């Protein structure tokens, strides 16, 4: 499994399709920045949210101290009161704990390039005080709107993307990059959850992918929902699955673009090329 230090080495970085957040996460380097793909499977729709969320965020909660309007809001779970994104109680990620969230640490103790809120959360999530975040600690820290923990696949995917040292742990700089990555996805998730149910249904997912620029059929979206949505009377995707689907779709689209030399939406490749492509691009 490949490692993507702070998201810099992620395969989509050479030219991502619409869908993933484009934000400078660490050291001025852009996660997934680059040229746009051809119109056949990736040109952003007019007015699409690709690149940055709307000014002030969906619920008007920009990050305190953020440099510009439109930055993602606070940790997932700290949304506007009253709706499906309200916080029902305390949680490792999404509410105040031990006075950490919102208070931060003395400015002089925050390393350059580290988000102050991410720094504060790092102190809380690093339960063993090792100076690193393990997969277990990360999973314990992240929750969805329905109070479920992030699934193992999404947590492992994000660890692989932001683990600089291939040690299975994330340092403070990697965590700051990961924190911003999640906030951007959270903002998009809220934007596409048009009925404010706290989850993404099949119609919302199809609309989201279309507005991100992906030309995919309703049948494909149905397959995705049957694979990843919760089993219930009203199947829906929580934030963790939404991040997983969109990030993997971005990676696979970039792999296809490398074979689609004419940028026409079709490519010819051998069976081994196909297997290699799918194996190496799964995060």
UniProtKB/Swiss-Prot annotation:
Gene3D superfamilies: EF-hand. GO terms for cellular component: COPII vesicle coat; Cul3-RING ubiquitin ligase complex; endoplasmic reticulum. Ca(2+) 2 binds at residues 193, 195, 197, 199, 204. Residues 37-70, 93-104 have a biased composition (Low complexity). Residues 113-148, 154-179, 180-215, 216-252, 253-282 form the EF-hand domain. It is found in: Cytoplasm; Endoplasmic reticulum; Membrane; Cytoplasmic vesicle, COPII-coated vesicle membrane. Ca(2+) 1 binds at residues 126, 128, 130, 132, 137. One of its GO terms (biological process) is endoplasmic reticulum to Golgi vesicle-mediated transport. Residues 21-104 are annotated as: 8 X 9 AA approximate tandem repeat of [AP]-P-G-G-P-Y-G-G-P-P. Residues 37-113 are annotated as: Disordered. The keyword tRNA processing does not apply. It holds the Pfam family EF-hand_7. It is a peripheral membrane protein. Keywords: Calcium, Cytoplasm, Cytoplasmic vesicle, Endoplasmic reticulum, Membrane, Metal-binding, Repeat. PROSITE patterns: EF_HAND_1 (PS00018), EF_HAND_2 (PS50222). Sequence repeats lie at residues 21-30, 36-44, 45-54, 55-62, 71-79, 80-87, 88-95, 96-104. The keyword ATP-binding does not apply. Residues 71-81 have a biased composition (Gly residues). GO terms for molecular function: calcium ion binding; calcium-dependent protein binding; ubiquitin-like ligase-substrate adaptor activity. Heterodimer; heterodimerizes (via the EF-hand 5) with pdcd6. Calcium-binding protein that acts as an adapter that bridges unrelated proteins or stabilizes weak protein-protein complexes in response to calcium. Acts as a negative regulator of ER-Golgi transport. This is Peflin. The lineage of its organism: Eukaryota, Metazoa, Chordata, Craniata, Vertebrata. The gene is pef1.
